[in-house]
């Protein structure tokens, strides 16, 4: 029975995924982007009037009434997993592998199955838009569709700006943004489906999902970290030595994973091998600033390892309670991680040393500053992503998901307004935006973060300080 989010699925579809990875590298020379077919297709996918390529593919396959019910259940199950996954590179990679698996299971003779990715086919941006940005699979009330479409327009506008490096001068945030500043700031937030913490279930996920995945006795799937490390170490500078906090033994452990087999992916010659397959990442680029990178390794850990969400929560509490004095957060992080026995609550040495290998600034950004990191930490469910399901309950969950009963919202946190503002904020960091527009976005984001009880450093500081 098909279960998403498995390392074995990624390795099994290596040949197809290599095409996707090759099409997710930036051109070697930026001036070549204008006529580059990959960049042209990505730009076209981000046009508000362009159809979703994944939706088009799926509808072309299910027109036939003989489409097996198992396809709908497998696809809905993948969508359910994506609903509880962080928006990052690893999630896009896992979704791509699972889509390959579903196609090979149910349409083995279709030509599209063996040419799923690459120019003229699906690209990383198409997977991001379908599964994580627009979430085309979500069941939505008819009266909400137009409002959500307006928010999706804003998201695609700023994602396109991150690709081109600038937001159109005609864009005006005040006239494009739905007014929320006069709404009541107390009580349940009207812009999303958050439940009160006193009435929400203990685990936060739906009851059927808890019965399917939760329980200390449930075995966990293998980590996806080896694939993440392998691919990024061979195609980018993100994991280049020396990582400031990786001592020699730690680096050798990371390299032992990478060197234990042939590289999963070897980038083509005519490509930028400093930024990796960044076109599968939300920011569509790898940029550095003040000891941080736009590709957050800690967000990748959330999607790649079952221990990561709890470990990072524990680390955050440890940093806050480490010293009673008014010591800066960056210093607190450095002091906590300076202990050679730091993070004993993480059993996997690879995860522990990857986190400890991050700079204090990277950890500060993820735990206390960046809205996208905070959103990822809020929506992720390690039980859904990494617990092996109970067979009978899993059959019920698949049927329910295929009927759309579990795809209306992420019950941990689901707010289109906040998600849209977070994308706009990332656009401020990675594209040229007018000063007035930038101030208006930060003002609205700050208010929404406060209303949703997301306690972070002020976004204006983060936008100037970190990548």
Swiss-Prot record:
Protein family according to the UniProt entry: Belongs to the herpesviridae UL32 protein family.
A Pfam family per the record: Herpes_env
Entry-linked InterPro entries: Herpes_env (IPR002597)
Residues given in the record as Zn(2+) 1 binding sites: 52, 55, 130, 136
UniProt subcellular location: Host cytoplasm; Host nucleus
Effect seen on changing residue 415 to A: Strong loss of stability
Keyword Iron: no
Gene Ontology cellular component annotations, sorted alphabetically: host cell cytoplasm; host cell nucleus; viral envelope
Protein name (database record): Packaging protein UL32 homolog
Positions of region (Zinc finger 1): 52-136
Quaternary assembly: Forms a homopentameric ring.
Coiled-coil stretches noted in the UniProt entry, renumbered to this chain: none
Organism (species): Human herpesvirus 8 type P (isolate GK18)
Binding site for Zn(2+) 3: 191-192, 415, 452
